[in-house]
Amino acid sequence: CEALVKDPKNQVYSLDNYFTGSRENHIEGVTYIEGSTEHIFELIDFAPDLIYHLGEYSRVEQSFEDIDKVLLFNKIGTLKVLEFCRKHHCKLVYAGSSTKFGDGGLGKDQSPYAWSKSSNTELIINYGNWYDLKYAIVYFYNVYGKGEISIGKYATLIALFTEQMKKGEPLTVVSPGTQERNFTHIDDIVSGLLIVGEKGNGDGYGIGSPETYTVLHIAQ
């Protein structure tokens, strides 16, 4: 929103149920609509040119105990967004999950979260074939930077480490710590999303760094 609203030609709206979002992150010039994607038809009475659908449930381990939220936000909500885009002829930019590429493609079914995201990308591609929906699917890799969640069970790794360091607490490293991860700063994600929103078409836009780091390396 912050990047989009800088262009005076853009009218920017944000639909957010604040499940993990915060009103403290609001940006001047953006119109905020409170509610969930499963109610998008009742909440939005106009036809946007472009929808960035970035607001699904997005945690792997936690999704096993939050499967009801995964199904509500990621399956029902995304179906409603797809139908909204089909009805109003909006282009959709969808945030897929890089988990589906893990273990040679076997990672797509290893958690409720991974399954929901992988199956959603298939559904979006089919909507493109069935209904001529304009879409682009992007994939993120461990995003960090301003606005991260730093406390609670939804905290991201770097934000959690930073918060623990500020408090002088030992860093929580899940054994063995040699797990390798790619990390991408939020500014790079935003730059990529703007390009994909303008020019992207179809599946397969990965936004990230080819460099990997172990969790222990990040902690050090």
Where are these regions (language model features)?
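Alpha-helical substrate-binding/gating segment
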Residues: V143, A159-T172, R181-G206, T212
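Ser/Thr-centric signal marking residues that sit
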Residues: T78, S97-T99, S116, T172, ...
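Short hydrophobic segments within beta-strands
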Residues: L15, A95, V174, I207-G208
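N-terminal Rossmann-like NAD(P)+-binding domain of SDR-like oxidoreductases, especially those catalyzing
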Residues: C1-V143, D187, L193, G197
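Hydrophobic residues at beta-strand termini and immediately following loops
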Residues: I33, V138, V173-V174, I207
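Substrate-binding strand-loop-helix patch
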Residues: F73, G147-A155, G177-V190, G204-Q220
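Hydrophobic alpha-helix immediately C-terminal to the catalytic Tyr-X-X-X-Lys motif of short-chain
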Residues: S119-Y127, L157, F161, I218
